[in-house]
């Protein structure tokens, strides 16, 4: 069963056609990769699917109730924030649903168990893992 249907997507930047009449579908359980040379619309397509950007033409259709988790190429960070505060941003840290304990468990798996460490002290790879944790904690049906 298709969970994402991309139908006739086109995107123009200035006078350059980045995506032209692109159609494809993603079935439940699929893991896909998009490859190509620079400037061919890979990131643009993903941003359109994630709702971060609008297509000039076409549409994206999702199965009912599907949620999207988006981790862009350059996530934004509050460099003074702790790792735990960053991944729980927008959530009550100590809520009745165990969000903080879920966050700590996932951060430990991702080898970021120093929860009070400031984001500014992390390496690039550690920052990417923190951003991934933040997205995964939302329990999206689809991760982009």
Where do the protein language model's features map onto the residues?
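ABC ATP-binding cassette signature C-motif
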Residues: 1-144
């Amino acid at each position: 069963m298709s969970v994402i249907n991309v139908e006739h997507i086109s995107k123009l930047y200035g006078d350059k056609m980045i995506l032209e009449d692109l159609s494809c579908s993603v079935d439940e359980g699929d893991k896909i990769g998009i490859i190509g040379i620079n400037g061919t619309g890979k990131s643009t397509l993903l941003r359109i699917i994630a709702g971060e950007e609008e297509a000039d033409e076409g549409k994206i259709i999702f199965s009912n109730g599907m949620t999207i988790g988006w981790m862009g190429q350059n996530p934004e960070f509050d460099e003074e924030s702790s790792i735990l505060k960053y991944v729980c941003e927008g959530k009550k840290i100590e809520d009745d649903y165990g969000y903080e304990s879920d966050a700590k468990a996932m951060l430990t798996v991702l080898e970021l168990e120093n929860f009070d460490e400031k984001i500014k002290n992390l390496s690039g790879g550690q920052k990417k893992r923190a951003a991934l944790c933040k997205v995964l904690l939302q329990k999206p049906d689809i991760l982009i």
